[in-house]
């Protein structure tokens, strides 16, 4: 069976910042009425923002001292939890709890997101899919601004190759807003099914905090790296697939499916963490 879109949820921010919105997400355009999804996303960062390191090169013991009071500190780790539900055949809502540990503070809740997705073009098998999405993120940690986001999710599949691109405009709102203009964040994935249930791919994420003052490439956040995908319930014709259907659960949901991926991201600029190990898991029912 051709490869199916991977882990998804609406909106994303990227390595190196203390986000009110979630980290390392790539959204798929598919919406199915009555389908619920529970998702976990996590990331562990290695190497602080190179542009913020001190000059003695000895590392990370006193990293917190190099940041201004109003400056976002990079993350050591993040753990996000999301629930999605398809309201109609075209429209779904989701809510997320965003948690993390910046290098200047202890682990805690960073924000809460409420998001929507509307499917404009349904992809059936190969071809194009298109959806519009948006959301509002409530900053919970001290000094964090609320954020709004809106944009398009595009995907294209040919054979065993799946391409997904997310482009979202982002803006800060509320008393803690530090920028007046819109920012832009993106994430793209190229995924290829190597054998049934297993795929490999490349993902890239980036963010321009303020389009009106974008600055040079090195002052933006960009990262890229490989990802491995495992979808034990991806093949409806496989007798060993890890699905539960109505034959096994009378009166229950038509299908239950698990998907996972693990990847590594490498920072391309001084403003991005050196590397990050990212992992995602999703249960659909």
Q: What are these model-derived regions, one by one?
A:
Residues 5-19:
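C-terminal segment of classical bacterial N-terminal signal peptides
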Residues 18-285:
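Transmembrane beta-barrel domains of Gram-negative outer membranes and organellar outer membranes
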């Amino acid at each position: 069976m051709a490869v199916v879109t991977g882990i998804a949820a609406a909106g994303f921010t990227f390595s190196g910042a203390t986000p009110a919105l979630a980290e390392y997400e790539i959204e798929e355009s598919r919406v199915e009425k009555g389908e619920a999804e529970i998702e976990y996303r996590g990331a562990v960062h290695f190497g602080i923002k190179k542009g913020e390191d001190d000059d003695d090169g000895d590392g990370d013991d006193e990293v917190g001292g190099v940041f201004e009071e109003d400056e976002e500190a990079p993350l050591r780790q993040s753990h996000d939890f999301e629930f999605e539900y398809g309201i109609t055949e075209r429209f779904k809502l989701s809510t997320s709890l965003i948690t993390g540990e910046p290098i200047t503070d202890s682990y805690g809740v960073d924000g809460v997101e409420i998001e929507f997705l509307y499917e404009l073009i349904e992809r059936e098998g190969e071809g194009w899919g298109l959806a519009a999405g948006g959301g509002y993120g409530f900053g919970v940690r001290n000094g964090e601004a609320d954020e709004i986001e809106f944009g398009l999710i595009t995907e294209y599949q040919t054979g065993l190759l799946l391409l997904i691109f997310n482009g979202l405009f982002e803006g800060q709102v509320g008393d803690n807003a530090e920028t007046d203009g819109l920012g832009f964040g993106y994430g793209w994935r190229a995924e290829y099914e190597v054998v049934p249930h297993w795929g490999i791919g490349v993902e890239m994420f980036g963010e321009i905090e303020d389009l009106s003052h974008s600055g040079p490439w090195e002052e933006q956040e960009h990262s890229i790296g490989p990802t491995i995908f495992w979808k034990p319930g991806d093949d409806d014709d496989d007798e060993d697939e890890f699905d539960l259907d109505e034959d096994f659960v009378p009166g229950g949901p038509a299908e239950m499916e698990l998907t996972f991926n693990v990847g590594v991201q490498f920072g391309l600029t001084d403003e991005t963490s050196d590397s990050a190990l990212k992992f995602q898991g999703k249960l659909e029912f």
